[in-house]
Swiss-Prot record:
The lineage of its organism: Eukaryota, Metazoa, Chordata, Craniata, Vertebrata. Residues 35-992 are extracellular. This is Aminopeptidase Q. Residues 2-13 are cytoplasmic. It comes from Acinonyx jubatus. It is a single-pass type II membrane protein.
Amino acid sequence: MGPPSSSGFYVSRAVALLLAALAAALLLALAVLAALYGRCARVQPSDLHHGGVPDAASSPRGTQEEQLPTWPPRPTREPAGTATPGHWRPPGPWDQLRLPPWLVPLHYELELWPRLRPNEFQSPTLSFTGRVNITVRCTAATARLLLHSLFLDCESAEVRGPLSSGPRDGAVGRVPVDDVWFAFDMQYMVLELGATLQPGSRYELQLSFSGLVYRDLREGLFFSIYTDQGERRALLASQMEPTFARSVFPCFDEPALKATFNITIIHHPSYGALSNMPKLGQSEKRDVNGSVWTITTFSTTPHMPTYLVALAICDYDHVSRTERGQEIRIWARKDAIANGNAAFALNITGPIFSFLEDLFNISYPLPKTDIIALPTFDNSAMENWGLLIFDESLLLMQPNDQVTDKKAVISFILSHEIGHQWFGNLVTMNWWNDIWLKEGFASYFEFGVINYFNPKFRRNEVFFSNILHHVLSEDHALVSRAVSLKVENFTETSEINELFDLFTYNKGASLARMLSSFLNENVFISALKSYLKTFSYSTAEQDDLWRHFQMVVDDQSKILLPAPVKSIMDRWTHQSGFPVITLNVSTGAMKQEPFYLGKVKNQTLLTHNDTWIVPILWIKNGITQSLVWLDKSSKIFPEMQVSDSDHDWVILNLNMTGYYRVNYDKVGWKKLKQQLEKDPKAIPVIHRLQMIDDAFSLSKNNYVEIETALDLTKYLAEEDEIIVWYAVLVNLVTKDLVFDVNNYDMYPLLKKYLLKRLISIWNMYSTVIRENVAALQDDYLALVALEKLFETACWLGLEDCLQLSRELFKNWTNHPENEIPYPIKSVVLCYGVAFGSDEEWDFLLNMYSNKTKEEERIQLTYAMSCSKDPWILHRYLEYAVTAAPFTFNETNIMEVVAESEVGRYIVKDFLINNWQAVSERYGTQSLVNLMYIIGRTISTDLQITELQQFFSNMLEEHQKLTVRAKLQTIKNKNLGNKKLNARMTAWLRKNT
């Protein structure tokens, strides 16, 4: 050590000794305090004592011969023994997202006792207790155990073993548990043992615990309040996927760690209990207060992951049927069952099971299937093995649902969840990074199931409408994510929840469809049969799937691929975005490039240099051609050249089965435009749809001129397919255009141009609405597209549309039992209010107050914002913040009002005078959302500054930079739209 510095603080030796003594005393005091406070982080062996926990659940079957050591639970949501981020601990496996591979769970004996009682559900929470015995196999010597636990108070913990291979006897030893603590960041419970577990031996972890059930949280265990037969009632249900099982019971909460489960539920006698398996038996017990509770036990499950564990406690009725010996029951509110609302779902569920059993040649392994309809369920539906959980709006038919897409929606979702019984339940992805293996294939087979039962079902067009259109609009290079991710990319549990998105479901389904298209359906299904059979009751990775496809491809000679299946498909699943395929029809030259939002001229600024191995199915002059492959960045295909003949044209991507967009040179687009104008029916509907959607998307992102897309619309007077019109209108009549008050130059031109072409399709569907609206019942594409057609016709001022709206609205207000046809109800309500007075507005308010279905209330909320009277809108906002009728999020009302032509100015003024009331209830984030809506039309930096100054006193400091950046993005978008609109206006002048 070098000499001391000339500056500093010096003390004598005596003073130094005194300071050292004081420091030691301080450290000792801190150590004592840490030990006392450490009960929140660790439980020492001296703290363990024997004895039962008052009012706690009895031991699971087979463990009642002795009590586990216990310690008092904490009565808070934060678990007893939680090591919070502020507590220091050495680095270790508890800092990793994945469990260490020391233990493999084999079997769970799980008992849960939620304290749900009739007429006692005023509190937002209720308590539950439970016990779980987990039989595990040790794979590596360890004196430390990790398993998942979140928001649970661990009341006792014991490790028994090693277990003998024969029947259980009393000679099983115990492994001392020296310490129990929680690593909150990664949601682990850690057991420090006094001895080492031996590889190859089996042990039993015995844990008792308690926690809280939250009302409407819909994670783990939750309870809901609803109305049935005129009475308020409560039910309890579960949602374990993806990582919420750990908040219900300590477990090894990873999908690969499958085990069998014996589940016991203790519940009030006035309720029934459901779980994955059939009921095995019932008995009774009394709690410390003498109250009687029912103990319901269930049969042993197959091997399954923790995320499929399910239970429900409710006072429901059911309807049932048997399909191939399997009992199928649908449970719902007693009113709903009595009214026959579950009949449609019940009638199609069995046949869907049978179809998939036959398709995969694998029987459904459970003896029963229960499907329960919850009054509200944010996850829409969940495929739990043996107990599927649905939001009732997606399972039950109402009497007024006849002219809606409800039957199709129920069919889609039931097919999806039943498909999971094979993809996900029988064969589970090894980890969440490959979640598309279950969600993508379940989404894909929705369409095969429905097409089987309804051969007239227009599978390609509906797939585009439901799946492809949405994901192609969101997926692009650099920003979006890949379908399959590397496990090491995940660092937090919250990232798993983010995987349930368009890329998992829609892109996953689209890639499965593309794979099927270039292999053919027989090869595709044969490979899936092999995959499902091999990995039944086990787990698989993406490479396992590719291996089975390769095996089937290698066993035949008809399908020849340019590369192994893995090499082809990994490009699509591991890379983000998708390619744009551009064909020069004069030379046959084809190239691929990544699709970007707002392509820039200097492509070197972008770093996405990936290519794909692209299957090109194509047609020439209406005739299907042989499959070719674009397996590098560019390639020449002489067979794709076209002559000067007006009858010579080429379309790539047959039936839109490839996951890419298609561009052509100017000659190629011109040929297609000419064919549309000469004989549009020569081009299949799916390709008229494709050309419109591709051309507008490519024009908005600088791949082609906007005039190229607009040229394709000239033929529309001859277009009688409403789904093609839908593609035109969603691309041409956008929300930005409708709400832009500066579009006065374009509007009259667009009105004249579109009405001239739209009148034919309008007359067709307006006649159906007036004379035989029931005819729409089985036309799914019309039910999907009609609202946009109706909305646009009225926005363009078509008098017949406005008159029909007035007729339907007046008929409904005079006789509310005469329902407005569902597909156009929102539009009719809006125009009824817009052209009405406060009398019509008050009528809707009264209807809102008497509606219980959230979907209907949302429609009415939107319609009431359509008023053009400032005083009515101001009163609406007052009601939203201060009056009783609006029990949902009042900021939604302000947002829908702000989006209206008159309302944006009313909301701005209202916020000046009422921000305190709004901010206290909803915080500044609601203000930020409103700011973006109000700022939708900004186009200068001065407008940004003015808007920020207006809101400056209401924003928190950390939000100001974010908001300015967002407003700058809006400004740039608006400037781009302004330039685009100017070019569209010029084109309309020439062609109107």
